[in-house]
């Protein structure tokens, strides 16, 4: 399936100079959405994962459906102040500053096999932070899956130590 037909490029959103990839048309097409979920779920099963992890917000849209389809647990990664129980936190560097990602302490069990799912792979900063959160709880990242890859924004060797799925490249 040509998924690019279901992803719109919105120029200068949310700020000038950014070409935003709008996935809402894909979500609004039952066949395209089902195709993405099926492909990601196959990848999760092939990786032997028992947990799917995803960051907010658009990662949740795909990962929750994939977790259901692959019959795995789903663990949320959120920005500070959004999770109600005790969290583990990681600070990571962005191009112009730092950011934090958090998950509930204990949601990843020692030995869990994890696939991380997100909508877009850009610089890789978020995904690298999530890998560290998983490893801090003695989980093992088996693979990473993305709907969209923006290879111009990251090193080609990024994530080479993992199985990687990228459904669309721009």
UniProtKB/Swiss-Prot annotation:
GO terms for biological process: adenine salvage; AMP salvage; purine ribonucleoside salvage. Catalyzes a salvage reaction resulting in the formation of AMP, that is energically less costly than de novo synthesis. It catalyses: AMP + diphosphate = 5-phospho-alpha-D-ribose 1-diphosphate + adenine. One of its GO terms (molecular function) is adenine phosphoribosyltransferase activity. It is found in: Cytoplasm. The keyword Zinc does not apply. Transmembrane segments: none annotated. InterPro entries: Ade_phspho_trans, PRibTrfase_dom, PRTase-like, UPRTase/APRTase. Keywords: Cytoplasm, Glycosyltransferase, Purine salvage, Transferase. Belongs to the purine/pyrimidine phosphoribosyltransferase family. It is an enzyme of class 2 (transferase). This is Adenine phosphoribosyltransferase. Pfam families: Pribosyltran. Homodimer. Disulfide bonds: none annotated. The gene is apt. The keyword Transmembrane helix does not apply.
